[in-house]
Amino acid sequence: MNTTPDTPTPRALRELTPLEARILGVLVEKQHTVPDTYPLSLNALTAGCNQKTARAPVMNVSEDEVTTALDELKRLSLVMEGSSSRVPRFEHNMNRVLGIPSQAIALLTILLLRGPQTAAELRLNSARLHGFADISSVEAFLDELAARAAARRPAAACAGCAREPLDAPDVRRREHGRLRERGCRRRRGFGAAFRIRGAKGRTEAPRGRSGATQCAGSTDGERTRHRRRRTGRRVLIAS
């Protein structure tokens, strides 16, 4: 009887808080940059979260706040606490929980630590975690991450917009390798505005004098303008 090794199954995860995201980013970063001190103690982890370089935004959190966030991450199995030392030490479990390769983990880590960046910036900033051959390889892994995120997200109405549900089949890979999505820029992603190809027969909101439309149901703090281009595409801009 043939048996196959167990492979990690990606889990449905909730949206992380800024501190939880920062903790995961710090754990992965320090695993590669200072392996001698990894897994990290609570003190070292807090210092990494409050680090003033290679961080955006800069944080000033206490050990108590980090401990609370660690408890939540442990419930999600994203962080594990070691028991081989008298001082508690923590390590990440992202590769197994998310089921993505190390190259994607490297890009995701830099995004967690520094926020939205271009593909060129990601290639430069992730050099210590993984050496990407060129920008196109970075974009390929970003496309894979975006496709996974969209496929794992259940169909739901876009927050603040009275528009169509966001369905996994709406994310398609074209032959030229570019990812197209239907949905709002406020969704989880990499900080980039996705170009959208309007579906035939879909009802569009009326255009205003400026040539832009505003989503129905948006609040003052959550407004999205849809700028249409002559080519039939539109770019979603969060304002």
UniProtKB/Swiss-Prot annotation:
The record's section on Pfam families has: DUF480
Q: Where is the composition biased (Basic residues)?
A: 224-233
InterPro entries, sorted? DUF480, WH-like_DNA-bd_sf, WH_DNA-bd_sf
Coiled-coil blocks:
none
Chain positions covered by the region annotation Disordered: 196-239
Q: Where is the signal peptide?
A: none
As for family, the record states:
Belongs to the UPF0502 family.
Q: What is this protein called?
A: UPF0502 protein Bcen_5249
Species, as recorded? Burkholderia orbicola (strain AU 1054)
The upper taxonomy is: Bacteria, Pseudomonadati, Pseudomonadota, Betaproteobacteria, Burkholderiales
